[in-house]
Amino acid sequence: MKSEPTSLDFTSSNLRRMNRDHSSNNTNRTVLNLPKEILIIIFSFLDPRSLLSAQCTCKYWKKLLSDDLSWRTAFFHHFAGDQSQIFSPLGNGTWRQEYLLRSTITRAYEKGKGQTVQYDCRVGQLTNLYYDFSSGRLYSGNWLTGTISVSDPTTGKVERSLLHASTDGSFTHGLSTMTLGKQIFGFGFMDGRVGVILMSRQAETPRKFRYCLDSHADSVTCIDALTGDLPPTGEIGMVTGSDDGSVHCWDVKTGVSLQSFQFRSSQILSLCFRPKYKMLLVDTFNYELNSYQLYLIPGYARSRKNEQPILLSSRKCVLTDEEEPPCLMTADCCAGVAFLSRGAPKNCICRVSFKEFLEKNDNVGVQTSSIPLNGKPTSISLDTNDRVLSKSTPGRGARLLAVGDENGLVYVVNTRTEDPNKAILRTITAYSNFPITDIYLNEVAMVVGSASGYCGVYDTVTGNFLKKIASARNAARREPINCILLDSNPLSLKGVITMSKHVKSWSYTIPKPFVNKRSKVLPLRPSVTHDNLSKSSDYSKNEVEREIMLGLDQIAQERREKMEARQKFEQHFGEGLVGLSEEEIIAYVTMLSQEEEAKRMVQLSMDVDKIEEDFKENDEQATSSLNALSSNHEPPQEQANVAELNEQEQIELAMRLSLMEM
């Protein structure tokens, strides 16, 4: 029997055997031999770049990281969420894309640098805003004066000519409401009239204000118009509501009311016009019943006379008109859900689901529930992810709704859940004790504006703070953030806000390797498309036409200015100088001024000579007057010797005295 080698028995064969056994034991203890569950947990601590690098280490890791489970675990570890977290999906349906894109965008907001521009739009207090991100044009409006300016947020350049809500370009009007879109600007007046400005070459009078052919009987309260391209003639492009309970649907090209609805003893509070889903939602207040009523007009794309409003829900009014806050409304037409705000003492968001009603055409299918809030709602906004998604996609195919209240809180709500107790996903404190004035959100970021002048960017998944856009430290300079806009494409980190009469825009960049990796997800439901509209591209036909239109307008304006200057020149100098160069005209004007100066000096010398002559003449007249006065005192001496004169001498003396008196 062979004995074990001792510490002194180190032959070559024994050393080789010991090294072979030691290497086999080390191989069993390497990371490659760990269970995949442990490796997935280890990988979840890595950032996206490290995960991509680890995928290139070996075949086993590449196979392991090709599984979507690894990226899902890393996603929830990075965003501090649980496996049942609900959010609006961003990528193409895989956890890998969701983790890479969302982490890159949030890091760009936190650490990235970009362009920030702040400038004055030259229209006063800003109340309306629309940003055409495809063409880079920003439309800023002030409904108090009825003026609109066109500017470029990337450079801060504002066009010289302003658009006015009047035919004569005056600021005196009775404007009650206004809305801005890509090619349609709608205006409502206190006397019931409705006007439009079309920003398209397809219109007969582009960039010119004109009234519609019909009007309401009372003041216009709300307007909703298409935010995209101009619809064809004969289709509805704008809807208006009035205090008299009437709703008109307008063909913006011709100004004709294609269809109208009358709600008896009611006031129109808000409208939700969605031609993509052929829906029109009308929220009214009935004076007789003292209640708010929500109506639906389905099958609504063209002018059809057989459609009648359908009552979906009725909400009892518990406060007076002065205490009740304005009713806010938005709708997720893809899911068949509408959301309406209610003030104290309810302080809630009413959720009205009419999806089953659309499928069964029965009022029993309408479901209403209330989502309680801590304060009076002041702002409401729906995210831009208008896609039909299944629950198997990341985030369970949810769509988010953000609600701000008077206490500075923001509630993130899942629009697709029916349980009101599970509807609120998270609550964010933006700025305490100041009401939220406006909210805008997409799949990744949510921008919140406060009445204190604060504006910040938050993550929609975790609610974490990402970026501060504006903040007024001085209380005297705190202006509320009235309007907020974000690009509907979450990969484009662009946005604008309004601060009193100023606009602040930002544009951050993300690494290019992540930009083009998002595959396009088409909606399941067909959308309304027009044959005469060009498809969207990097530089579309509409943008080219818009640039040509602006160039032609600029040339025409310069030509008019030259004609006015020429007419004024002809009035002053005549037609003989037309055609001279600028230097020749300056020389001619200088010569005329020198001649005028010489004439003035000659006239001045002549006036001085005349004054001297007049002075001499007056002096001579004064001397003669003194002599005459002295001669008047001499006759008494002559009278003393009259007795010595004969008769003929006395007659001559009398005649001489009479002549002197004359």
Swiss-Prot record:
InterPro entries: F-box-like_dom_sf, F-box_dom, UIM_dom, WD40/YVTN_repeat-like_dom_sf, WD40_repeat_dom_sf, WD40_rpt
Ranges for domain UIM: 581-600, 646-662
Cysteines joined through disulfide linkages: none
Keywords (A to Z) from UniProt: Cytoplasm, Repeat, Ubl conjugation pathway, WD repeat
Domain F-box: 28-74
SMART domains: FBOX
Xref: Pfam families: F-box-like, WD40
CDD domains referenced in this protein's UniProt entry, alphabetically: F-box_SF (cd09917)
Coiled coil: none
Record's subcellular location: Cytoplasm
GO BP field: SCF-dependent proteasomal ubiquitin-dependent protein catabolic process
GO molecular function, one term: ubiquitin-like ligase-substrate adaptor activity
Transmembrane region(s): none
Intervals holding WD repeats: 215-260, 263-302, 429-468
Subunit annotation: Part of a SCF (SKP1-cullin-F-box) protein ligase complex. Interacts with skp1.
Name of the protein described by the UniProt record: F-box/WD repeat-containing protein pof10
